[in-house]
Amino acid sequence: MSHDFEAMFGQVLGQGAQATIYAQGEYAIKLYREGYPKGNVFSEAYIMANLERENFPSPKVYEVLFVNGRYGLRMDRAKGKMMGENLAGNPEKTKATLDVLVDLQCHLQKRGNVGDWAPHIKLRLRNDLTRNAMLSAGRKEKLLGILENLPDKEALCHCDFHFGNVFFDGTEYTIIDLLQICRGDPAADAACSYVSYSFIQRELAEYYLNRYCGTSGIPREDVLQWLPVYAGTLLGQVPEKFKPLIEEFINAAQVME
């Protein structure tokens, strides 16, 4: 049965693999695809509620919805424009925007230790690797061994911080897509961003990494050591066209030995 969700919630603001965002006045409705795990919806609402308490620059969440077989969240509508808008074909503007995002990311990572409400990134990555049926037993064992020896820290990590998840209204920033937020090594957060930018353009990812390391003072190798592990969680979870890149990042574990 088809449903007219635009009539229910308003015009479509954006659409991704897991959810569609609708405008409802000053609110936004994030409506997840049918079959999307119920636990993930409530986890995101829980994370958003805790971020609000810590004055993190993210939308406030108001309720969990269940409409015609699909879960959703009603939250504040992000103000301003997405930082990734109108960057295509303008490399100088792209780099200038990336500079701003790196400064913001480093600032957020230095907010202080995060409470126990946020899962530790090593635990999340361990669970994701263990559940990933696309990894052979040997690869899984190797990546879990690498993960075990990576640093334990307590910084705030968005784990999906890039052009598309930050809005700016000329005064304030708003950060969205908060399900992956963890506490842990800030270098791990940077590794996640590096992979996201690599999906767009490898040169862009390298520019990001150089800028991030220069701003944060974190050595390049500290970021790159997280790549094989994070890439291992993505194998089979991202579009097929990115598989060679994911394989390259996983195989970097051989070079690191």
What do these predicted ranges mean?
Residues G69-M82:
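Conserved short submotifs of the Hanks-type protein kinase catalytic core
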Residues V12-F42:
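ATP-binding glycine-rich loop module of kinase domains
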Residues K38-E54:
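The N-lobe alphaC helix and its flanking beta3-alphaC-beta4 segment of protein kinase-like domains
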Residues K38, C192-E257:
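Helix-rich C-terminal or lid/interface subdomains of diverse kinases
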Residues T20-A23, L144-A188:
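Active-site acidic catalytic loop and adjacent metal/ATP-binding pocket
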Residues K110-C159, D169, A253, E257:
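An alpha-helical support segment within catalytic cores of ATP-dependent transferases
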